[in-house]
Amino acid sequence: MLYCGSTGGHYMIMTTNNNSNNNNNNNNNNNNNNNNNNNNNINQNHQHQHQHHHHQQQQQQQQQQQQQQQQQQQQQQQQQQQQQQQNYGESTTSTSMIPPSITTSLTPLTPTLSSQPQNIQQQQQQQHHHQQQHHHHHQQTQQQQQQILSPMMGSKRKLEEDMGVGQPTSNLTNEYLMSNNNSLKPILVSSPLLTPLSASPGLTSMQMAFANASLSAPSTPLSMSPSLGPCSAPMSPSKKSKNSRSSSKSKYQNSEERWQSTTSKDNGKPSSPGIVKGPWKDEEDAKLVELVNKCGPKEWSSIAAKIPGRIGKQCRERWFNHLSPEVRKTNWTPEEDKIIIDAHASLGNKWTAISKMLDGRPANAIKNHWNSTLLKKIGGDSKSLNKEKDDDDDDDEDAEDGSSPVLSPISLYQSSSSTTTTTTTTTTNSSEKSNIPPFALSGSTTTSTNNLNNSTNSTNSINNNNNNNNNNNNSSNTNTAITTNEPLVAPKIIRAQTTPNSSPSLSSKKTHDKQKVPQSPKNSKQQQTQQQTQQQTQQQLQQQQQQQQQQQQQQQQQQQQQHIQQQQMPVISQQPHIQQLPIDQQIQNAQFQQFHLQQPSMPSSTSVNIIPNQSSMEQHHYQQQQQAQQQQHQQQQHQQQQQHQQQQQQQQYLMQQHQQYQQQYQLMQQHYQQQLSQQHHQQQHHPQQAQQHHPQQVQHHQQHINTTHNQHQQQQQQQQQQQQQQTNNSQVNSNNTDTTFSNSHPIEPHEVPYYYDYWGSSTSGSQTLIPSDNTTNTYTIENNNDFLLFDDNQHRIQPLQQHQHIKQEHAQMSHLPYHPTQPNNLNTTTTTTNNNNNNNNNNNNNNNNNNIPTPNMSASTTGTINHHIHQTHHHLTTPLSQSTPSVSTDQNNYINYDISSLFSLPNEI
């Protein structure tokens, strides 16, 4: 099988055989030619280096880095050769197509096989000779550098070791090419008009594409040659690639390889051969958006410097055509199609001017939409229309393919002859002599191997004669290999696309097309028909717009007339709609109307006047009702205020009475304390007389207190009855009055003290000293004859532990001998006077038991009162020697204040 690879203006067919000696000779010959050409270019660059001596230190550092890189490359090449040797078989033949190795940016590459003209090489030789005389030292250093930087040094040494021959390898290539054998025909034709490969912006990207291509056959030593690999033709920087994300798969398997190919090894900046023409990746888009947000959509050169492999023009077009937020990505509407068709009829292919008519649609998108869909709708000839002037040649990035221009797919066919033939368009005498089939290059002629060999150096011509013998000896082996195999299949190469720089005719044609008039006379008929159809569509659109304007004007006029009529109409018709009366008012109005209808009819003259005044009468009636309601509301408020004032007066009166009662009570207390003090004084001197007169005084005092209490209770009942009558009257008069004030200000309860609240009432089982609702508790006397005691912190004291001590204190207080008794012994001897007094007090309390709170008294006063009450009550009941007081065990009836003063009476006295 044979494979063909081609890029730009170069075409190459590579054939291999099992004989590895011929392949190695070709590689070595090509290496020598490239080294000679590279030496010439190095000498030219050496003049600039001699002027800048201060850059030598930097170059040394760079050389060290490059040495390391080349060592890595040599190791990789050795590994590839080992794999190739393992894959080779003795009886099989295979071909492969691998791009040349990547060279450094310091030494620009030259066309293969010395394709430059002889004049150029002679000038280079003269310059080289002149530089050898003046700058011999610098040439030696530079030659050493070139030996280090040469990408094929490792492979050359490897081939010499494999061959085991000490003869120069540069003589092998010409012998192989000059052989008259028709069996093997390596074909390589290069145009003399091509620029050096270093000027080609798509070189490295294509090389990496071929390097990453997966082929079935293993690589051969031909792949080591920097000149026999497929290389791309130079492209103009103005030609843009396809930026659409929906393109085919990327030709780079690894992103690092892509960036290494696009950046130079010296400064890390994008070089001219490192411009990427492939589709944009997501990483590049994200980086571009970030840089535009920082720098703004202006400084495209600085933005492109931060994106390897991209120039400012590519960044600008990528932003404005795809990434800008102003770009619309929605489907095209029929309105937009009409605008484009109409604008194209008048302006032609001026896409930038047309894009100004559509918001969010860039010129490139409009152009693509025109070429893809609108031309089919119109039915015009796309070829004739595309011949017109296109003012937006720079915006055709989406119309082109994402990769560099390559040939169309190769079609293979079988031939009956043993030799290979190709279809050609032009032939020359030189190609017939060398038995090399010519290839059709656009605007260029083919050159033979004789012309190429004449332009080489004198040293190469001598070596070529020596290599002819080797090629003749090896021709027999190749003939046998080809005859044994089946008829070979030759590639049929069809040129699909050419680059602008590969042929001068394209560039001249392009400049000529730019100078053309947009509308040529050849296409005038077709354009006239298109213009007529477009004019008709424009007229229809204009008519529709006029009709719409007329309809809008009519609607505006109608609205104005309606507005004027509404202003002229009386207010009567609008009032029921503007403000509706409440339902009660509407019912009253209906009743009022029925009442007037029942009345006898008036003359026609009067009836005419009544109708327009009917609404005014309703309003007047409604106003009267509102006024009446307001008056009622004011009266109710006035009554409420009066009631509130009366309540306040009553409260003040009650407070005054309460204060008077407290004053009287305090006076009585003082008087009673004085009497008690006198009695104590008398008891010390005359204890027997005090015991006789004391019960009578207590009875007289209790009667006086009961009478005052009954009077006060009667007054309070009368006041409560008066308040109830007033509240009943107010509820009858005002059923719908506001009760918020009375609820928010309730009458506070008054604390009215009563005599029995302090002295208590005796029952059959207990005797209350200070009964109350929540604040005070009861003190009872039970049959167990035990006191319930509390300390200063109101903690209960165990009475059984201090029973003997208490009795001893009572005996000391009464100056009587102490007779200890058992706590369970019950004393049944009681006086009849105490029972009678208790019964009387109980009757009074039961009759007057109304939940009236007690007056607020301090703990000291209550303690002293209870002490005296207990003392007097104790003297009235039984003798101290025979009975002991008892206290109930009910915790709810305990006294919540300190009664320790009961037992400290002798000390105070």
Swiss-Prot record:
UniProt GO cellular component terms: nucleus
Membrane spanning stretches: none
Biased composition (Acidic residues): 390-401
Biased composition (Polar residues): 216-226, 497-508
Domain HTH myb-type, chain residue ranges per copy: 272-327, 328-378
Basic and acidic residues composition-biased segments: 379-389
Signal peptide positions (record): none
UniProt entry keywords in alphabetical sequence: DNA-binding, Nucleus, Repeat, Transcription, Transcription regulation
SMART domains in alphabetical order: SANT
Annotated region of DNA binding: 300-323, 351-374
Subcellular location, record wording: Nucleus
GO biological process: mitotic cell cycle; positive regulation of transcription by RNA polymerase II
PANTHER family assigned: MYB TRANSCRIPTION FACTOR 42, TRANSCRIPTION FACTOR MYB8-RELATED-RELATED
Descriptive protein name: Myb-like protein Q
Protein species of origin: Dictyostelium discoideum
Record gene name: mybQ
